[in-house]
Amino acid sequence: MLLVTGVSGALGSLVADRLAGRPDVVLGTRAGLPGTRRVDFDAPGTLPEAFAGVDTLLLVSAGYGEDDTVVARHEAALSAAEAAGVRHVVYTSLSGDGDHLTYALAHRWTERRLRSSPVLDWTILRNGLYAELLAGIAAPDAEHRITAPLGRGRLAAVARADLADVAVTVATDPAAHRNRVYELVGERALGGDDLAAVLGAVYAPGALADARAAIAVSGAAPFQVPMLTSTYTAIAHGFLDGTGVRSDLRTLLGGREPLDALDVFVKAVRVDG
């Protein structure tokens, strides 16, 4: 049996859609919504029942929080998986070129924890940053200007739907991907000029300090300020353009062309707008 966690989230819900109706799949949500098992990593007592009878766990990262919170969640999940007799964990991690991001630590800790497990087989999906994310951090303002501090840097963004397809491929045939690490970044790196041109906007990158101040007064949680500013500066300084890793995306999509990240960005901007 395959258990997918976090199916009320953006990535997990896409995975759940692709697995709908399969009798060998169960879905997990923190609240234990109808038709799902309650999987609350902040309440480890819920996990033995949730993991009962599970052979493969697709652990969608519970990365919304401070490092110690996320690490504790993932430790609870992996300890419970070991105790329940889960054989294989597929984990949605962060691209290998993302080590300069402040939220990389919890991902790398989880990867190390998986590798050191005496009983678990594993597959690590090192997901690149979503094309949809760009709609949240680099959308044009009311004056049709994109002022996100991306500098002249570029992001090898990847469509969330493609990552969901890969997760399903791996999680439904885990033995074929045993103890493998896959890099999943986009094939086309996008810069601020690209984003502006497709929207008929102007790219006028602002200062990182201005972005930090704006995030701080926007109602963001304290841990989100360094998350977002590190994303901006990693893009601006060329660490997320895809040249630092070799992407396995197309191979794991069965050879099909990945979705166009620029198209995904445009659609997301229009939905958010």
PLM region spans:
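Structural motif corresponding to alpha-helix initiation and N-cap regions
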Residues: 13, 41-44, 71, 75, ...
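Short, amphipathic alpha-helical "lid/cap" segments that border enzyme active or binding sites
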Residues: 48, 75-78, 160-168, 259-266
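N-terminal Rossmann-fold cofactor-binding loop
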Residues: 27-32, 40-42
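A hydrophobic C-terminal alpha-helical subdomain
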Residues: 212-273
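Conserved Rossmann-fold cofactor-binding substructure of NAD(P)-dependent oxidoreductases
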Residues: 37-55
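Oxidoreductase cofactor-interface core, primarily capturing Rossmann-like NAD(P)-dependent enzymes
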Residues: 1-24, 42, 52, 62-69, ...
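A general structural detector for well-ordered alpha-helical segments in enzyme core domains, enriched
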Residues: 73-77, 109-110
